[in-house]
């Protein structure tokens, strides 16, 4: 099986530069002249973007993206993309090329966030059962396990799918296959230490109770599903129910929720690792704005991949 896929070349369902600029101006009430000043371009350049449909150069597009993420509530942008895209779950289930691209990219990025040294090409080789030089066997297991977990996720997730305890444990069992010391499919029996938070994690005795409470609320989305899913992701990571694999399982749960609600999957990329962990740390202090924006950015990357 061939996975002829790049890491960053995602050109599917996106907002145009013109749409992003309009949202920036609406959110900030700045004039075209002020926007030109902030982007360090001429007024005529902004005029061409907005009124003549001229596309910005790559460097200019990056500057526009930066302002867009800084000033615009990305939930609205995600909802707009949702209207443009019919049933991302169906696309992933029915289009093999897009499904393979999703599984490869998601596996590479999610494992890299957790410290894997595998490149995307090496991840592809692992999927194909080919030899991967200069990598530990456990890194190859991690890649294949994550692929299998995503296939299980896509096989089982439906519109309106309900997260259950058994589903979470099964995801962990697949992610930790061949890592018996990590208790695949079972909660941790001791304490764990995290380096990126000062918040005390629940004791192993409290984990089943905390997960039980999590399950009771996880399928109730209210009127703002994006914010709820972002909060749920933080809450799961704050419970940290397993000895290992919490981040990977947590991101798989988030993807399951998003697909079941008609959104594209959230793809947290390795280059956003610091921003991702910072958003979780801020949520420790009760500030959820960053984790919501981070979730939205990752969903938008999912929409890019679907095209």
Region spans (language model):
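FIC/Doc superfamily catalytic core
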Residues: 1-244, 248-307
């Amino acid at each position: 099986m061939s996975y002829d896929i790049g890491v960053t070349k995602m050109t599917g369902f996106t907002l145009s530069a013109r749409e992003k600029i309009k949202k920036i101006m609406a959110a900030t009430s700045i004039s075209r002249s002020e926007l030109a000043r902030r982007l360090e371009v001429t007024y005529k350049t902004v005029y061409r973007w907005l009124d003549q449909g001229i596309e910005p150069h790559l460097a200019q597009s990056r500057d526009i993206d930066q302002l867009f993420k800084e000033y615009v509530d990305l939930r609205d942008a995600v909802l707009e993309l949702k209207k443009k895209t019919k049933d991302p779950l169906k696309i992933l289930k029915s289009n093999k090329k897009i499904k393979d691209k999703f599984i490869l990219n998601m596996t590479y990025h999610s494992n890299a966030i957790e410290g894997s040294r595998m490149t995307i090409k090496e991840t592809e080789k692992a999927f194909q059962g080919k030899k991967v030089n200069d990598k530990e066997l456990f890194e190859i297991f991690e890649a294949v396990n994550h692929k299998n977990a995503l296939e299980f996720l896509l096989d089982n997730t439906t519109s309106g799918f309900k997260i259950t305890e058994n589903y979470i444990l099964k995801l962990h069992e697949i992610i930790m296959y061949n890592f018996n010391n990590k208790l695949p499919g079972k909660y941790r029996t001791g304490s764990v230490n995290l380096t990126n938070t000062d918040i005390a994690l629940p004791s192993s005795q409290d984990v089943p109770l905390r997960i039980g409470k999590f399950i009771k609320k996880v399928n109730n989305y209210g009127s703002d599903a994006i914010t709820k899913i972002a909060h749920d992701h933080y809450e799961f990571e704050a419970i940290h129910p397993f000895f290992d694999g919490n981040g990977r399982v947590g991101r798989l749960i988030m993807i399951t929720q998003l697909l079941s609600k008609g959104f594209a999957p959230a793809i947290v990329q390795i280059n956003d690792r610091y921003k991702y962990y910072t958003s979780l740390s801020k949520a420790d202090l009760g500030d959820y704005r960053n984790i919501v924006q981070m979730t939205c950015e990752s969903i938008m990357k999912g929409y890019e991949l679907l095209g």
